[in-house]
């Protein structure tokens, strides 16, 4: 979003979307399609879309140039030894191979021969630079077993991100590359490739990645949760992905507003989710239609008595929103038989005057003994002052309307720790239960809502419709609770 803002609004420039598809073992067409779809959902329209694989020939030539100039070499050191040597600043035993030998092995890598598969190509930058990103990074490696989703089996070896990024950025005409601060150590490496290959300069602008408490953004760790079935997928409402927060109920206008307000700061901080969801509440509160839901568990039957009690069920049109008449009206049914939540019934005292929301006041005349409470009786007092009562309760008529089954879902953070360190064992910090569901009954007006609609259940909160009443065989509405910035 920041790239889109700076490209199109701040500087009247062009936004380029490039998909880095240099590892056929990890890249799939469905992933690239999901990225493009997510950007479209956020209203981001790149002026150009390209793939690193569009430039495989150019990258191959760049690697040849580095080898021929003595700035790259082939290395068959095993992964663990190479990692250890780089960490300790020790030169590889293959570092001084001749140019001719390196070119020969590069050809073997290209055809995927037995010898070629044992080797990689490393840039010959430094052995012991304090910045470990400069310690002879790998720039080409073999992968003959996985077909590339765009180039098939044409290539047996592929460039790494470290080589591909500066070469392709320069060639494609990128003027400003916005990179998160996790890549800051790689900036000198990026510049080394630009200078050594005599490429057009690219200006790098670092900004801090947006981090949140009790959340981790590592794709590798998130993939573990997906693969293990700990979450429902990449669009799970607990996931810190665009699709995840949208499924939780974040609106695109609120998301854009929040991100642009943060700006391209270099300060690395872990933010509380509160301000994120509070921004969303400002967006949805003025337009979310109000409805009622009563929990099915231990539901309490309420008998209405008194001269003002209706003889037969009747309905009235009431505003869907108390401050926004443009949203329309809903049908509210009144009768002698109501249902209320167990928690409300337990709070009542004999003789207490309460307010039955959208109807009026009533006196509690009887409360059935027992736990849970099964029934109560109330006498209407519609002349009573609703401002004088302590308790305002929601309710539904059990007569004169069809009550709609609903699932009310709520979600917790994935981890118990505010910030997960790199060395932390993920399993030890996973929240045991992160999704809870309660069955409820809603007023019949909710049957009109479809997936992604947002409503408010009075005294409960805001909910996004994950499945509409008619969207499936079960004839129920599935609702996901939307955080508001208070609590989780």
Regions found by a protein language model. Name each.
Residues 1-12:
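Histidine-anchored nucleotide/phosphate-binding helix
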Residues 9, 40, 67:
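Anion (oxyanion) recognition and catalysis
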Residues 14-18, 25, 29, 33-34, ...:
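Basic, alpha-helical terminal appendages of large translation-related enzymes
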Residues 15-21, 170-178, 236-242, 261-265:
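Glycine- and acidic
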Residues 21-23, 51, 65-222, 230, ...:
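Active-site cores that bind ATP or allylic diphosphates and position pyrophosphate for catalysis
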Residues 34-38, 62-65, 189:
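Alpha-helical scaffold elements adjacent to nucleotide-binding pockets in ATP/GTP-utilizing enzyme cores
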Residues 202-279:
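Long, charged, mostly alpha-helical binding arms that flank functional sites
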